[in-house]
């Protein structure tokens, strides 16, 4: 949207180069505005700019909603360090991620119900072309934790406000920032009960400790 590009240009972080500005502009312009604007190529590029490695994108519909299926590459294992500690969007990411595009303002309850009724069985992402306030997100989290906490796949919601915030981040910081801003409002358990292998990302930030283990 033009207003978002104008905001970005007026609030460009100090030290940004022309390349940073162009990257942010492209990220903003790939955002879907209205059902007719959704196309697979734009969604694929949007998620590549967000920090995923998307091989291809297929557009579809579920009920009355526009969806896209991303075929993605998971993060490599045994790296020296990771950008974030969330394995389902890293080394344990599935080969396909569903993206749902919703348009128009709705209450927190309506938003959750509209997403849940689509019957998606694995973690997915909602792009909401509307604005969520802090109160909206808290209401959304409360409804998820108390009413939709059994048998429902986790999903992350990116609204226009968050999308603009992400545009103002450098490209390698967008995915970690998105997870930090969305995971508190959904159900996700990064830990496993009992014994078992630990995802590489769980050593996030512990570079020296991880190096010492590998050198043993």
What label would you give each PLM region?
Residues 101-103, 201-202:
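Short, flexible loop segments at the rims of nucleotide/cofactor-binding pockets, characterized by
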Residues 211-215:
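Phosphate-binding P-loop
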Residues 90-91, 115-118:
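A general structural signal for short secondary-structure junctions and capping/turn motifs
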Residues 172-205, 209:
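Conserved adenine-nucleotide phosphate-binding loops and their immediately adjacent elements
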Residues 1-92:
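Extended, compositionally biased accessory segments flanking or bridging domains
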Residues 105-116:
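A short, acidic, amphipathic alpha-helical segment used as a generic capping/interface helix at domain edges
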Residues 102-105, 130:
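Residues immediately flanking
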Residues 59-75, 85-86, 94-98, 120-182:
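Charged, structured surface patches that assemble and position nucleic-acid processing machinery
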